[in-house]
Amino acid sequence: MFLVLVLLTGLGRLYAGNNPRKTFVQTTVPERISSVDTRRHLEHNVAYNITLKGKSYVVRLKKESFLSSGSVIYFYDNRGVQRSQPLLPEMDCSYSGYVAGFPHSRVVFATCLGLRGVIQFENVSYAIEPLEVLSGFTHMIYEENNDNTHVPLFGKNNSYARIHNLESQGRRSVHKTTVSKLSPRYIDMYIVVNKNLFDYLGSDIKTVTQKIIQVIGLVNAMFTQLKLHVLISSIEIWSRSNKVTNTRRPDDDLFRFSDWKRKHVSLKSHYVAYLLTFDKYPESIGATFPENICNEEYASGIAVYPAGLSLESFAVIIVQLLSLSAGVMYDTSDSCYCSTDVCTMTQEAVFASGLKDFSTCSMDNFKYFASQYGLTCLRNTSYDMPIYKQFPPRRRRICGNSIREEGEECDCGTLRNCTHKKCCDPMQCRMKKGAKCGTGPCCTVDCQFQKANVLCRKSVDKDCDFDEYCNGRSGDCVHDTYAQNGHFCDSGGAFCFNGRCRTHDRQCQALIGGDSRGAPFACYDEVNSRGDVYGNCGRHQCYIQHALCGKLVCTWPHKQLVSRVNLSVVYAHVRDDICVATTKTVRKIIRDLSLTTVLLPEDRDETFVEDGTICGPGQYCDKWFCKEVQFINNGSCNAEIHCQGRGICNNLDNCHCHKGFVPPECAPKKGQFGSLDDGHLVETTKTSGFRKINMRRGYVVLSTKRFQLIFYIGIPVIIIVAAILIKQNQLGKLFCRGEKEHMSSVSEDGSRSVTLSATESKFPADTEHSNKEEDAQ
């Protein structure tokens, strides 16, 4: 027994590595256990029972993906030649989660080849590593401590502190309404490990890679508040020698590293490059360019790993530097507070163990930076993981179901109840001879198009839906038109979504009736954290931020029980309210109440909260998730600008004008209203009658202004063409006259030359004759 104790003590010192302050706690054999989530999704959810200081703790974990199939590690062999390997084997190893029963806890594990990671409570952290020399899945647990607590945060120049003071002065004058809501953003990171750190972490490619991935896992866990997620693009390890001179002055080394990055690494503009180094007694913890995360030239940093610190502390250093580049400054005010004992952006955070959260000042800094400068360089989607699409089975065409489907000219119902027997053949769904239409609310029994302006679809929601009218050119009613998603309704307390004003109260009234209302948040949190058929967000229980988007929970003020056909009801007494949640029983008999009945959002029924329902200030529900309202609509129509504040935007991105204003731009016009899409005829002038609106969005047929358009465009064109023709005719005459004169002069010259030639030919002959006569004499 004594020998075993000595062995474990020695192993504890060995696995503690270069930090002599790591306190060995115990060895343990983690036991993988089964739960609701792990039974349904073995690949994405795991749970372990871990004994720590004599107590048993259940650790619940969910897979985290910050590697892609294209992530690569680069290193150098003994000859200095660069080699590369995919990081694919490490892709499915990273998990994060919490300790059950401890809301202020955090767990980050790598599960390949044993468990390796950190368990964080409020004021203490424990590291766990596998003991490879012992069999039976034995692990060692030790308490994280830091030996070196005197590392300067800023360095000698203290530049970040000065920047913070200047920024704080400027930001105090900015009203909080300029702060935007946070949305998920992804930082693609190119990580370089220099030779010093490579040697300090073990001088082994695989070991160093695992530790870097573990550090980034901790970084992502800390960035949850800011909705930032670091994705590892590549890891380059300078395993032979440093490519950049290490001067031990991070501020100077940063410029050298940035210059090396520009010359040797081809990165996209939204990639951030970081050099991770080691220094026993550094001047500071690192360097970066504050507020330049989106600047291609300056999106880089240097993080220094001081001797005697833990991997947890190194993760805090990286978080602080990345935060600086994203506009988050260090906390220097007593008014900054957070939910943990130590806030992330403080010097104490680097050396303290346990949980750390961003302070109120940090959150304001980040939101201000995002609203003022934007984070468009950062992707808003994670890596596209390959999945197989689940195509729904193709629906078979059915003639006689009163629905006109592909391949049918009309469908008036069955032979017995056909609504347009004169117009449509109910057996073949073909229009009869001479019929203009065969079915539809705008088709008369005489097979003619209904007159324009006849109501064909009445609004079902006074705030969010619009009436539609026959346009006089089709037997069908025009496409459904309704308010743009995100338009306020219910006196500003809810959002319009797909033509309905979505509120918890209305949904409860429709589901169970009586004086039921939407339950308070405490009820939703209590019920939807169950993870069963009565409370869930589909495949699993709802996390607290999404609790209002799972199963519908209502208050029930009546003494009698809820009695509804095909509904099973559960009651919960939360504080002063009786809350009820329901599940449908008509589809199948519930045999296992620990399992949810719906796996896909498309399969939800009325017992779930509807999409578009408010789940927080400026937030709405979408497929079990509570999202920022900025994502609720992607249209370009702005009611204040495009509709001049006299209408609202519809789902087709056009203005629906209030009464007394005419579309499309809602100009004042007595008696007018609506949009270009609702089918009714829009009056344009007192004398010219009406302008007919085509069913196709944005296409307008101008029946009265067409001739005016032709007149105003055609007349100038005709004048220009006529002028050209006249000009060409005059030029032609001039050309012909010039040609005639030229020919005349040519002919005169020719005749003159002929006469002259004849005269000249006569004189030599006479001269010769006279000479002969003189010779004879």
Swiss-Prot record:
Subcellular location as annotated: Membrane
Biased composition (Basic and acidic residues): 763-777
Residues of the Disintegrin domain: 396-485
Compositional bias ranges of the Polar residues kind: 744-760
Tissues in which the protein is found: Detected in testis.
Cytoplasmic side: 728-777
Peptidase M12B domain span: 185-382
One Pfam short name: Reprolysin
GO biological process: binding of sperm to zona pellucida; cell adhesion; male gonad development; proteolysis
Disulfide linkage: C294-C377, C336-C361, C338-C343, C456-C477, C637-C649, C643-C655, C657-C666
Coiled coil: none
Signal peptide coordinates: 1-16
Transmembrane segments: 707-727
Ranges for region Disordered: 744-777
Topological type in the membrane: Single-pass type I membrane protein
Name assigned to this protein: Disintegrin and metalloproteinase domain-containing protein 5
Organism the protein comes from: Cavia porcellus (Guinea pig)
